[in-house]
Amino acid sequence: MGRSSARDGQMPLRDIMDKKKRKNEYALERLFGRILSPFEAFLKRTTAGGIVLMGTTVLTLIAANSAWGDAFLRFWEQRVRFGIGSLQLEMSLHDLINDGLMSLFFLVVGLELKREMKVGELSSWRDAALPVFAAAGGMVVPALVYFAVNPHGTAAAGWGIPMATDIAFAVGILVLLSWRIPPGLIIFLTALAIADDLGAVLVIALFYTHEISLGAIGFASAVLFLLLLLNRGGIRHAIPYGVLGVLLWMALHHSGVHSTLAGVLLAFTIPARPARAPAEFEQRLVELQNAFHAEAAAPDFVDQPLSNPRMATIAETLERNSRAVQSPLQRMEHRLGPWVTFIVIPLFALNNVGIDFEKIALLQGLCEPVTMGVCLGLVFGKFTGISVFSWIAVRLGIGRLPSEVRWRHLLGVAWLGGIGFTMSLFISQLAFDDRLLQEQAKLGILTASLLSAMIGMTWLYFGGTRARPNPE
């Protein structure tokens, strides 16, 4: 139905708009387009987040070990106060980023989880079984390795640190090697990392909590109930969810449960169904295209939306219908994703990665039990857990390898699973109050992530040639 207008000799709506854009484009606009287009293309690349995070990490380590290192580290301890009226909240910049801004990170993680569970790789047990089993092994074995090195004392609380995989770094490396690996491997690692994130969220909720305030928990439960009512009632506007999400964060902040979990809980209440079905949108699109052609053919046609209200109405209706065919979950994920990738996570790295190698005594620090436990857990624990649990799942018939993926590919992914970084750094802040133990954990995370990335890249580069599909 939508193609009939093209067959009848009418120019498609997209071609008309592109032609008018080229006609009306000024020379300066074209110049800015040539300058900004490469930058915009970079921001849209899958690897961009990992590249920015890597650059931020290097700059943070340089700053922390420079002549201004002490001032740089003290900067994050400054106190800030914000609120409305008598409702005031005071915290350090460090806590504002870790407890506040990182809630947006967990919100995006929750949105990704819900999407994958609804329509993605985790939507059916047959597809989800292998990455879920692999993620389980990649959490259990590293925790056991760490606990074997640190079975007693305060250091034992860090067992959750090596359980997480950083999806930005790991998937970014696979994308760089995409010409040497089957496409199914990237999908497998993405599903594994998302299942891994779910496990990390559960660990934080169940084991890294402070003294529980039942009153605050009760208030948070009431807010969560209201969010669920909004979802069931078909409310798709973002503002009510945003307001209640802030109240949920404040309640959890005073409850003893880590406040960033508000992001995950909020994400699971965001509607996943669009207001307008695709078939209805297609019909509306054809109607708008016909209306646009009729307007363009009118004798009094004015090629300027500011002085042509009918043309402006068509454009506004098209924009409104385009929003309606997207679910609130999609819109929120697309809007928040770049902010989290390029603002929140780099700020988190600036705030948490800084290590003064002189104070920690680098060589001695590498031999500390916490550093060794984290490093061994991430590098060898992740590799062993992911590979062994995957083998068990396939042997028992519970899961299956993705199309064209062979065991040599999966072993490369198992090495990349040792890139912990963001979530591991976050858990280390919850596990230890002692600054020295936090520094040792950071050193272990950075060392393990670097080793895992190097081993995984080398393994997949030399052993990751694409498998030929089996003949029928």
From Swiss-Prot:
Cellular location(s): Cell inner membrane
Pfam families referenced in this protein's UniProt entry, alphabetically: Na_H_antiport_1 (PF06965)
Protein's GO biological process: regulation of pH
Bilayer topology annotation: Multi-pass membrane protein
Keyword Transmembrane tagged: yes
Keywords: Antiport, Cell inner membrane, Cell membrane, Ion transport, Membrane, Sodium, Sodium transport, Transmembrane, Transmembrane helix, Transport
Any Gene Ontology CC annotation: plasma membrane
Gene Ontology molecular function terms on file: sodium:proton antiporter activity
InterPro entries in the cross-refs: Na/H_antiporter_dom_sf, NhaA
Transmembrane segments: 48-68, 91-111, 129-149, 157-177, 185-205, 210-230, 237-257, 337-357, 374-394, 410-430, 443-463
Gene3D superfamilies: Na+/H+ antiporter like domain
Catalytic activity, as annotated: Na(+)(in) + 2 H(+)(out) = Na(+)(out) + 2 H(+)(in)
HAMAP family the record matches: NhaA
Protein family per UniProt: Belongs to the NhaA Na(+)/H(+) (TC 2.A.33) antiporter family.
PANTHER family reported in the protein's UniProt record: NA(+)_H(+) ANTIPORTER NHAA, SODIUM ION/PROTON ANTIPORTER NHAA-RELATED
Functional description taken from the UniProt entry: Na(+)/H(+) antiporter that extrudes sodium in exchange for external protons.
Protein name: Na(+)/H(+) antiporter NhaA
Gene name, Swiss-Prot/TrEMBL: nhaA
